[in-house]
């Protein structure tokens, strides 16, 4: 009986415990919010904003979507959400089983999943859409109060407030300023504002300055202020350009994720160009410093596109890693400025501004050029290098730069380059002795060089150099002065301008491989040449003259460089300018991204036609006669063609027989005709471009013709083919294409150059379309805007492949026709910019 009574009491106790547990779970237990596909910095803002002990956030990996039922709300971030059909089914199943789920900001309609009622969805959207610390905190409380429906330990949620936008801000995250005047008044009241100090505007950023996760922003503001600058952080999308105009900054720092001013991109670029305001685009990495430094790529994919590639359209420079994400004591990833890189980036900004403000006579410039070993001349793609460099030096002197001892003639200057600016091979011992005697190199003692190395290079990086080449200064380009080993740095001293031949980036015989990416650390002379410019000469700016050298191809990362990447270390904090051909976009991107270069374009050699049509006139006449001849007499006409083709040697180029008794077939005649037309229409470059020597009007016209005629001809042909007006076999005939498309295109270019208005009416006439068709092409090729209304994505119109191809051909006709005069003006301006005498009082830098 006692056992039964005891068992009964136990059952009662268990029921009481279960009832208490049920009551606790229903009314008081911790509210769990699961996060799907949120970036670390977004998660950090949500977690750090939460002040309630009975609310927790947890990240849910995509491979654990089977656990969604454990959460009181599953909140997903739809942008960039890539899930399989199976994973999507798991989310839908959890929603069907009663789990509150909301995928916010879904860009894929299939991921637009929400099991909340419309009012609750609107409430969550209002909180997260106006993301700031206060709204995030109240969103968590709203979830506990209204979605999880808890009764105990509940702090009532306040209404969502509109996040501060189109404002300036400072270190106090509770303050914002609607006008520049109000902001400057605040700075003066705080004793921070400096009269006549440089103004630095900060725009963009992955992390919102009002979200709580902003230590990196605060660090940058403080660092720039401590360097004597007035800092203007702007939080705005719609009024960004208006704020910049009101501020009038000396420089803009854009934490980029796309264009700097959406909707006004071109207007912003023009405004900045007019005022010579540089845009810096430092990078924020979504990983820890250790992870980033060990990654050989640095950055890739869509994140690289938005952070590096697209900002280049605005003219952004210095894709310099400034921030990373680090774990705090709670295991939350927070954005942090990397101390060493923040210090260097602040110096970079200061050095650029100093370069703008310092008198030309005081500026010190180190100019690197490229030449082979020994008596090889200077080289640069498409450039007459020696006369161009000589013209630049004369221009610098005319602009007030301190250029001393410049030879009176170009010939004497070239001789100076060969004696004092030589590049010596590792085997040229006799030549090196002569160079020491007559070349006047800068001698850098071992102790001084190693002190520079200690300041500029990490120990691990320099250890690779010592392992490969031995202790400094090594055996190459080294000597002894007063008992101390020294590096001999080749340089030509012209006062405040110094010329340096770029040394070999590695030791070996394969010059091409050395220039285009030696896989090893550079030798001491290479390092010494760059460190001497910074520490020995004290340069204010570095210029690489001509396309191209080896700096941007030294190891390691492709982009988003770190302290273990050679270009990052050798450029240091110097403003770097690269005089680069306009015709090599691919490798110029390497220069911009891997050596932080601001590229200054020079023209390609002017284009002309080969002018060989006259040589083929007799042949083309015989071919035309062949086509007009009746079938019975065609063998005779074919042999007439063959005699001329063999006489001109065309049979060898086309690998045809030379037996003059055997006629060519119709197919072989067509091959000869196409080959002759191709040669006759071939574009070729004339003499190399010389800086300071403008194109002649005729060369400008021939270059515009070469740039314009082909795109128009091929685009119109593509439209005609799509409409069934021509066949593929007709378009394969070079003679047919020339007669029906290329020659009319050339005539059109001549007419526009002669003054015909290049407007929509002309575009429609050339393309054979109506104005409505032109407007439709614009619509098809315009990327769909991601219209967000309470997190819902709009569905873009779908177009067929034929519609897209037609639109692209129409757009190419429009682009080319409307730019014919622009090409002409650009060539005129570019060829005049670098004339040897100044045309305007402003310094060219």
Task: Give residue ranges: language-model regions.
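Ligand/cofactor-recognition surfaces for anionic moieties
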Residues: 11-832, 836, 840, 845
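Extracellular interaction modules
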Residues: 3-10
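Alpha-helical hydrophobic/aromatic positions enriched in membrane-embedded helices and signal peptides
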Residues: 2-3, 538
